[in-house]
């Protein structure tokens, strides 16, 4: 067991945790953002990152320092913390990005690890091989073997108290990501960055990014802190946190500012396209777009970088509050609606509902049904799985969206998207869900799946479904032999079908509207 990371709260696979960084003598609350600091271009001083934005940890490129005539000796003599005037934790990269960009670097794996140790890095990184998304499986597997060897070599380097990253590669092949993660987790290394995802984000391949993260998570233990290398845009933080990422590093705040780009949780705007600033951070409260445009290049870049950091740190606070309230997936859905590619990422996340369900709390606040995607959430899957553990009472059971009826030995409630459940569970999560009046077809289809699960588990029992006009696709998916009863008109629901007949010829109970037998 690794004792540097502790989970405090969670929702879906997202978590609020504490990462202990012994060399820095500090604990970092996660999810955390590591602003990237280029020693040659300090758009915002590290001291300001700490004092104004609350940054507890930052990242800089150890390879740039290693090759810098200006900074190498200063870093060795004074240490990173004095060099940057930063009291929090400092992570260093090894030059793997330069390797992926230029094909070679002028330092060995062991040399760069020792250099990172000697300059006082708190979390160092070996030289892994970032495989581009377009690489073949054979090339990806070969690169992965090299990365594995370098992680094993990193274990033999005396790094003192410095934590060491164990990058998880594997390209766009989730099984290779899982294999890489299992190997990395089996080492004595400490933090687990999911690497080579920047090209996926740059091309808006958020579905592939999520599959890479989920593959890596399958190979890691619950005590493994996960860093999404190169992820710095706030629009995807909630999605990545829900998939299980704890750390993010952002050069975007400065790089985008240099190009007059303005970050939001819904995407990126060019300053020239803005007539209003849709933000209340100190920069946006004190300036109009025209005033920002009137600044000289250096000051405008600095102001935009500050805004970009404010919105990024604010989003992480929003995510943490969503985790505490148990509505992280609802936040993810709202963020996903900002861009079609984010919808792809959200759908890829929900395809792994089985995986998410293992970490998702059994009880939280209200479940809000926001769209057809909500029908695929892990809470719905958990309810369907729970049906296998419930028993029915009697030979004839009614599953009803209305009330009960004397023809049946027992009546269970029926509620899309969850399906059937005994009345005793009516006040339990997630069956207290807030639902729109006009549900989409996927809610009914998910409920029908729950009915199928219950019917299949009780083959000797006769079941009937009393519904308020379910769509044909949901009804057609029910098992043969299930009696279908159409409920009648309801003054509170004028859009429902008004066909009526008494189900058994007896006077129905007061809370059960009359209906018709669709199987007659």
UniProtKB/Swiss-Prot annotation:
- Among its keywords, does the record have Amino-acid biosynthesis? no
> What positions does the entry give for substrate binding?
128, 196
What are the catalytic residues?
Answer: 93 (nucleophile)
Q: How is the cofactor bound?
A: Binds 1 zinc ion per subunit.
Annotated transmembrane regions: none
Q: Give the GO biological process terms.
A: tRNA wobble guanine modification
Q: Where is this region: Disordered?
A: 485-520
Reaction catalyzed: guanosine(15) in tRNA + 7-cyano-7-deazaguanine = 7-cyano-7-carbaguanosine(15) in tRNA + guanine
Q: What InterPro entries does its record include?
A: ArchSynthase1/Queuine_TRR, TGT-like_sf, TgtA, tRNA_ribo_trans-like
Q: What keywords is this UniProt entry annotated with?
A: Glycosyltransferase, Metal-binding, Transferase, tRNA processing, Zinc
An example Pfam family from this entry, by short name, is TGT
> Which residues of the sequence carry a binding annotation for Zn(2+)?
279, 281, 284
State the EC number(s): 2.4.2.48
Q: Spell out the molecular function terms from Gene Ontology.
A: pentosyltransferase activity; zinc ion binding
| Compositional bias annotation for Acidic residues | 503-520
Q: Which domain of life is it from?
A: Archaea
Task: Give the GO cellular component terms, alphabetically.
Answer: cytoplasm
Family affiliation: Belongs to the archaeosine tRNA-ribosyltransferase family.
What PANTHER family is this protein classified in?
A: QUEUINE TRNA-RIBOSYLTRANSFERASE (PTHR46499:SF1)
Q: What is this protein's record name?
A: tRNA-guanine(15) transglycosylase
Query: Source organism lineage?
Result: Archaea, Methanobacteriati, Methanobacteriota, Stenosarchaea group, Halobacteria
* Gene symbol of the encoding locus: tgtA
């Amino acid at each position: 067991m690794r004792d540097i990371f502790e989970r405090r709260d969670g929702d879906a696979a997202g978590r609020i945790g504490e990462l202990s960084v012994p060399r820095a003598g500090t604990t970092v609350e996660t999810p955390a953002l590591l602003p990237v600091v280029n020693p040659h271009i300090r758009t915002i001083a590290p001291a300001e990152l700490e004092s104004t934005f609350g940054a507890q940890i930052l990242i800089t490129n150890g390879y740039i320092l290693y090759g810098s005539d200006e900074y190498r000796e200063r870093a060795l003599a004074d240490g990173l913390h004095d060099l940057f005037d930063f009291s929090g934790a400092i992570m260093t990269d090894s030059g793997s990005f330069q390797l992926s960009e230029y094909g070679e670097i002028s330092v060995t794996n062991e040399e760069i690890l020792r250099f990172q140790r000697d300059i006082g890095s708190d979390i160092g990184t070996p030289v892994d091989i970032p495989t581009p998304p377009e690489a073949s499986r054979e090339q990806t597997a070969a690169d992965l073997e090299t990365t594995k060897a370098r992680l094993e070599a990193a274990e033999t380097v005396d790094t003192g108290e410095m934590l060491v990253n164990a990058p998880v590669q594997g390209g766009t092949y989730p099984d290779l990501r899982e294999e890489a993660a299992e190997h990395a987790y089996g080492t004595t290394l400490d933090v687990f960055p999911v690497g080579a995802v920047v090209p996926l984000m740059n091309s808006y391949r958020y579905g592939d990014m999520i599959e890479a993260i989920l593959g890596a998570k399958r190979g890691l233990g619950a005590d493994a802190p996960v860093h999404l290398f190169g992820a710095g845009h706030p629009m995807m933080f909630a999605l990545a946190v829900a998939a299980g990422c704890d750390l993010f590093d952002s050069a975007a705040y400065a790089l985008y500012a240099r190009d007059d780009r303005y970050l939001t949780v819904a995407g990126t705007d060019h300053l020239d396209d803005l007539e209003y600033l849709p933000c209340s951070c100190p920069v946006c409260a004190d300036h109009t777009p025209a005033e920002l445009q009137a600044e000289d290049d250096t000051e405008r870049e600095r102001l935009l970088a500050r805004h970009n950091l404010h919105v990024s740190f604010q989003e992480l606070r929003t995510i943490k509050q969503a985790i505490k309230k148990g509505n992280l997936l609802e936040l993810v859905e709202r963020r996903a609606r900002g861009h079609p590619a984010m919808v792809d990422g959200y759908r890829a996340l929900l395809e792994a509902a089985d995986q998410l369900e293992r970490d998702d709390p059994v009880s939280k606040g209200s479940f809000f049904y926001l769209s057809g995607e909500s029908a695929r959430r892990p809470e719905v899957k958990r309810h369907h799985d729970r049906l296998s553990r419930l028993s029915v009472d009697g030979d004839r059971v009614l599953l009803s969206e209305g009330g009960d009826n004397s023809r049946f030995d027992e009546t269970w409630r029926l509620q899309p998207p969850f399906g059937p459940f005994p009345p005793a569970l009516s006040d339990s999560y997630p069956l207290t869900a807030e639902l729109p009046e006009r549900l989409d077809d996927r809610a009914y289809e998910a409920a029908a799946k729950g009915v199928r699960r219950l019917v299949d588990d009780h083959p000797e029992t006769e079941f009937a479904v009393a519904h308020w006009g379910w769509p044909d696709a949901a009804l057609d998916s029910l098992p043969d032999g299930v009696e279908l009863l159409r409920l009648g008109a309801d003054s509170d629901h004028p859009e429902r079908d008004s066909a009526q007949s008494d189900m058994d010829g007896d006077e129905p109970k007061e809370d059960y509207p009359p209906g018709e037998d669709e199987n007659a």
